[in-house]
Swiss-Prot record:
Glycans are attached at N103, N178, N356, N402, N672, N743, N1038. Residues 1084-1145 are cytoplasmic. GO terms for biological process: cell differentiation; spermatogenesis. InterPro entries: CATSPERG, CATSPERG_b-prop, CATSPERG_C, CATSPERG_Ig-like, CATSPERG_N. Testis-specific. Specifically expressed in the principal piece of the sperm tail (at protein level). Expressed in spermatocytes and spermatids within the seminiferous tubule but not in interstitial cells. Belongs to the CATSPERG family. Disulfide bonds join C45-C106, C160-C166, C289-C344, C395-C403, C634-C856, C802-C830, C878-C1042, C905-C914, C1006-C1012. The chain crosses the membrane at residues 1062-1083. Keywords: Cell membrane, Cell projection, Cilium, Developmental protein, Differentiation, Disulfide bond, Flagellum, Glycoprotein, Membrane, Signal, Spermatogenesis, Transmembrane, Transmembrane helix. This is Cation channel sperm-associated auxiliary subunit gamma 2. It is a single-pass type I membrane protein.
Length: 1145
């Protein structure tokens, strides 16, 4: 018997060794194709993204602006056709008004061919949309939400010569959510097909558009100019881009010489328009406003979440956009509004960080109100200004008679106003004014001259410092709320950690004067000088680097021009400089003849610094020849982060996934109907998210759980119909493709943000791999004793009174590695209990490897990346994504245990089980984590109140504060308590009980003056009542920063009747029973006599009736006989009567 492999053919031929030449040929073809794609990748392919309206989907060249902010009802008819699908036809499916049209391009290649090639190879663009929460956390709860979608391919609806040659694009819905106007769109591939690097777009809502009578979109703030002239930029220098960081949906940029025009962009200058503003530009100069000339130039322009501010001469205007996802439509402006009409405003100062649910703008005055400042507050689109100080001037508190406030910055969370004040002698002061307590303090007297700091990187300004003859010329202030770093800048840079002691950064030359400063709020800063130089430095360090112009910039710029880059030119002008997601971007106008254009380009600081790095080397003898040995500028070879919390868990981001429905089309192309279904499903998914606020804990606290709860058992049947082309409309809806994600793949790297609740902590492990010579000394091959110093890491906490940090270092000599375990713990000191998003303490942690900043550059496909330095924001307070829920399942189980029984209502309701009045009621609660999917028992303290109630669900009413006190307080003396407990702990004012999971429970009372007293049954079932309960841990719980507030309804049945009504019922029942007994007794006694009397009466009646009948008969017979004799002859013999009569006679 011959044994063969399981898959060998059944034949008498022995198995032979396979010929592998064909395999190697195929492998070579595959490698060549991969090589060709690698070459394409080196050509820097990039994603393309435009916004399409719902009705324009499929039009290849269509492009729209994000003007409509309400869902539309356009998909209902399509969903009605989807029979035999898991959707509920009774639901009202809406859609979003826009699609995202996606494609990609590579230099020198046809876009249409690239798209077709990518689709046939299986490439699918993945789209992740991240929503930024609103500034006003009082109106909109802070939450971080993202949704991951897969783009669906669709052929263009335009003319094409052949089906295979049609223009191909990918589409996804463009969803939006209430409370958000800023959304970033990340696009990347599914890993199949051509390589296109991940790219981020900003698709923000535009609330500054209107429609004319014909329905055409127009700008409400001005008139769009179709031509961007080079003269606009020849005469204008670069200017700062001012906006509320992370929350401004549009950017505006003024500064065009003698023109009331601004650059406007709702995509972070991915595209833009030039607008001529529709403002009056009237001149109101007077004796109190010392401005010498008039100019139409827009000098200052600031963008906030909803409102734009501009300054022209001394006039200030604002325009509030129409954002119905943030506030009522009536808050929007119809025209520019002029504010502070009687003031002469010399400057607007931005406030980059919001606070207290509002945004702020500062207006500096001159003239009659010199020494005062106007604080503008923007809340829900409503603008108000307040002049401070009230009743006295800042100048009154400083030496000299007059002063001038040259710059101001506002720390909203502290309510501190930092002022750069110049007195009449020319001396500058740093002044702090507290807007809450109305106090003013002089923090620092700025030196008059530049310090002498030869051959030093920095200099601490003490009394022993010597100074040069160059005057200090302060120009402005900058404060970073995340690390408490304050900068004073001009022809110098001063930095301070405590606003009282300053460090002079000596690398910045005193010959240059800073024009403006920009910050990434991720540890990086850049400044632009009057000569358009760009300098760069890392916060917490002391080295300042000139990046433009520099040797590195010349090298990089020339290489780009050699590659014929469309972003570089021989003749160009810097328009502005700003950070976006930690990367530094330039807005540059290129003066190429016939191709003048404005471009947004990345300034690769890492690459420029790498080009600028020195190349130290030594010549060493190796035998008979000499060799060059380069010295490492970076102290480590590699750096790795391990044991890092997941990004979306640390940043408290709720993630959803929505994939397009499968279609039966042979090439996998979608059409308008299938995309409409995709729209409806995405809308319903986010609608479930927004409406998920169930007070009763579900078995699975996922918004999508109930969506498919009763349909999952039929999923095989639905797939069977689709696979056999029997599904309606040729669509298959995969229920697993619309769900919440708790563990995302590829979620690696250090998080961009950490949220810490009370006493919480997180750990990060940093592994530093050294070069071969790090662990050896110059004269010995053995390990040195200074390894920990060569590979040292520093951890700096911005607020050490709030956080504690420990670093544990392990040296692995055999691995040439140093492991640093970092643990950060909240000290429970710096935040107060509050709702989600409120009372947040914003701080940060900085990681820095000794000698790494500026010396360690990692080369990547996207350019050089600075290594060895990282700033991580930390928010201390109640983290988003946590909620309190009533654990009804465990409450019922525990009730059955302590009461030895559990009786539900006769008519059961699975959503709201009943509890018996006479049973002890001990509620339990869950803390549900909507980000991680975890849930656990709430072990803190809380206050329980009955705040409403009714006999039915429809008649529940809310009680007044007085009623709540009477119904719940142990101090009540009106006999109105609804419940009581044996708990002895109460609030400080003794008004309410403080309970916990260990409390003995609630005993229902329903006393005489309570609303549940003496409930009359409406049927044969016992009385019942619905209580509206409020549970809050505010002020009584020390286990969390979260102010949990839960309102839920408890259904109680078996309520007793009042004593009066009970007595009345007993009396009535007893009386009725006694009467019935007496009646029965009387009946039993009298009945025989009644029967006898009745019988006697019947006998007599019968006799009487019989007698009367007899006499009547007899008399009638006698009369008849006499009458017969008178008419007839004598009777015949033989008659008995005759014989009797004869005898008688």
């Amino acid at each position: 018997m011959v044994s063969r492999p399981a898959m060998s053919p059944v034949s008498p031929v022995w198995p032979r060794k396979p010929n592998l030449w064909a395999f190697w040929v195929l492998r070579l073809v595959l490698l060549l194709s991969l090589k060709s794609w690698a070459e394409d990748a080196l050509q820097h392919c990039t994603w393309l993204l435009v916004l399409n309206k719902f009705e324009k989907v499929g039009l290849h060249l269509s492009k729209d602006r994000f003007q409509d902010h309400e869902p539309i009802d356009t998909v209902a008819k399509v969903f009605q056709k989807l029979t035999d699908s898991p959707i509920d036809p009774s639901e009202n499916y809406l859609s979003f008004p826009y699609y995202l049209q996606i494609n990609f391009s590579c230099p020198g290649q046809n876009i249409e061919e690239l798209a077709r090639k990518g689709h046939l190879m299986g490439m699918k663009p993945m789209v992740q949309i991240n929503y930024m929460y609103s500034v006003n956390f009082y109106r909109w709860e802070m939450e971080n939400v993202q949704i991951l979608m897969e783009a669906a391919p669709m052929r263009s609806t335009g003319y094409c010569p052949a089906e295979a040659m049609c223009v191909l694009n990918w589409y996804t819905p463009m969803p939006f959510k209430n409370g958000s106007v800023v959304s970033s769109v990340d696009i990347y591939t599914n890993g199949i097909g051509p390589f296109v690097s991940k790219k981020r777009f900003y698709v923000n809502m535009n609330g500054f558009l209107k429609r004319d009578a014909s329905g055409k979109s127009l700008f409400a703030i001005g008139y769009e100019s179709l031509v961007l002239k080079s003269s606009h930029f020849r005469l204008s220098k670069s200017r700062p881009l001012w906006y509320t960081v992370n929350h401004a949906p549009v950017f505006i940029l003024g500064g065009f010489y003698d023109e009331k025009s601004i650059l406007f962009s709702d995509s972070n200058f991915q595209d833009y328009v030039l607008l001529e503003l529709s403002i009056d530009s009237c001149w109101v100069g007077s004796f109190y406003c010392p401005i010498l000339g008039f100019s139409a130039t827009i000098h200052d322009a600031i963008a906030t979440e909803s409102t734009l501010f501009i300054r022209q001469n001394q006039l200030v205007y604002y325009f509030t956009g129409t954002y119905i996802t943030l506030f009522d439509k009536s808050h929007g402006s119809s025209r520019w509004v002029r504010v502070l009409p009687s003031e002469c405003i010399k400057r607007l100062c931005p406030v980059y960080a919001s606070g207290n649910g509002s945004e702020y703008v500062l207006a500096l005055t001159t003239g009659k109100n010199e020494g005062y400042i106007h604080i503008g507050t923007i809340t829900d689109g409503l603008v108000s200004f307040e002049m401070v100080p009230d009743g006295w001037s800042v100048c009154e508190k400083l030496p000299g008679k007059n002063c001038s406030i040259d710059w101001a910055t506002y720390i909203a969370d502290e309510r501190n106003l930092l002022l750069l004040v110049k007195i009449d002698s020319g001396q500058f002061y740093l002044v702090n004014f507290n807007t809450e307590f109305k106090t003013l303090n002089i923090l620092y007297k700025i030196p008059e001259f530049i310090p002498e700091a030869k051959e030093l990187d920095f200099l601490v300004l003490l009394d022993t410092v010597t100074y040069t003859n160059t005057p200090m010329t302060p120009k402005g202030l900058f404060f970073n709320t995340l690390n408490n770093m304050l900068y004073i800048w001009g022809n110098f840079i001063l930095q301070s950690y405590n606003r009282e002691e300053f460090i002079f950064l000596a690398d910045f030359p005193k010959e240059s004067t800073i024009k403006y400063m920009v910050n990434s709020f991720k540890g990086q800063m850049a400044v632009v000088t009057e000569n358009e130089e760009i300098w760069y430095f890392l916060e917490g360090g002391y080295d300042v680097y000139q990046v433009v112009p520099s040797q590195g910039w010349e090298t990089y710029h020339n290489l780009q021009k050699m590659q014929k880059s469309s972003f570089h030119s021989e003749d160009e002008s810097l328009v502005s400089l700003f950070f976006e997601d930690g990367k530094l971007f330039q807005l540059v106008y290129l003066f190429d003849v016939g191709k003048e254009r404005l471009v947004k380009r990345l300034l690769p600081v890492g690459t420029l610094m790498e080009y600028n790095l020195p190349k130290p080397f030594t010549v060493v003898n190796q035998g008979n020849y000499q060799a060059i040995s380069f010295t490492h500028t970076c102290p480590f070879k590699e750096i790795h982060l391990i044991d890092v919390p997941k990004k979306h868990h640390a940043s408290r981001t709720e993630s959803y996934v929505a994939l397009p429905p499968l279609v039966s089309e042979s090439l996998g192309f979608h059409n308008n109907n299938t995309l409409a279904v995709y729209q409806g499903l995405v809308y319903y998914l986010l609608w479930l998210h927004s409406k998920y606020d169930k007070p009763y804990a579900d078995p699975v606290h996922d918004p999508t759980w109930r969506w498919w709860q009763h349909k999952t058992k039929d999923k095989d049947y639905f797939f069977y119909l689709f696979s056999n082309r029997l599904a309606a409309e040729g669509i298959y809806i995969n229920m697993n493709a619309y769900q919440k994600l708790y563990n995302m793949s590829g979620d690696y790297g250090i998080p961009d943000l950490f949220f810490l609740d009370k006493g919480n902590w997180f750990t990060i492990t940093v592994v530093l791999l050294s070069h071969q010579d790090t662990f050896t000394s110059s004269d010995s091959q053995g390990p040195t004793i200074n390894v920990d110093k060569k590979l040292a890491i520093a951890v700096t906490i911005a607020d050490p009174e709030c956080l504690s940090v420990t670093v544990t270092q392990d040296v692995l000599l055999n691995r040439n590695a140093v492991i640093n375990k970092i643990k950060v713990i909240d000290k429970k000191r710096c935040s107060e209990q509050g709702m989600i998003g409120r009372n947040i303490k914003k701080t940060s942690m900085m990681l820095k490897v000794l000698g790494a900043p500026g010396n360690c550059i990692q080369r990547t496909y996207l350019g050089g990346i600075i290594q060895g330095f990282k700033v991580v924001p930390i928010f201390i307070g109640c983290p988003p994504g946590k909620r309190l829920a009533f654990d009804v399942s465990y409450t019922i189980m525990h009730s059955e245990e302590i009461n030895k029984h559990y009786f539900d209502c006769v008519i059961k309701d699975a959503e709201m089980p009943c509890f018996l009045f006479r049973d002890l009621f001990q509620p339990f609660f869950l803390v549900q984590d909507l980000v991680t999917g975890d849930s656990g028992s709430f072990l803190g303290s809380y206050v329980l109140k009955v705040v409403g109630g009714g006999r039915t669900l429809n008649t529940i009413r809310d009680y007044t504060e007085e009623e709540i006190f009477r119904y719940n307080s142990p101090l009540d003396t009106t006999n109105s308590l609804i419940w009581k407990t044996k708990v002895e702990r109460t609030t400080e004012d003794k008004k309410f009980y403080i309970m916990s999971h260990e409390s003995p429970g609630v005993e229902w009372l329903c006393l005489e003056n309570s609303p549940c007293y003496d409930i009359i049954p409406q049927s044969i079932y016992p009385p019942e009542f619905f209580f509206k309960l409020l549970v809050s841990n505010r002020g009584v719980d020390n286990s969390t920063y979260c102010d949990y507030k839960l309102t839920f309804i408890v259904h109680i049945h078996g309520l007793p009747l009042s004593s009066k009504r009970t007595s009345f019922i007993v009396m009535v029942s007893t009386s009725f029973f006694i009467a019935l007994v007496v009646f029965y007794i009387l009946f039993c006694l009298v009945w025989p006599h009644i029967v006898k009397a009745w019988v006697s009466l019947r006998w007599r009646i019968n006799n009487i009736m019989a007698s009367e009948s007899y006499y009547t008969y007899a008399s009638s017979t006698a009369g008849f006989s006499l009458q017969s004799h008178s008419f007839e002859g004598p009777s015949r013999a033989g008659s008995k009567e005759d014989n009797v009569q004869a005898k008688t006679a």
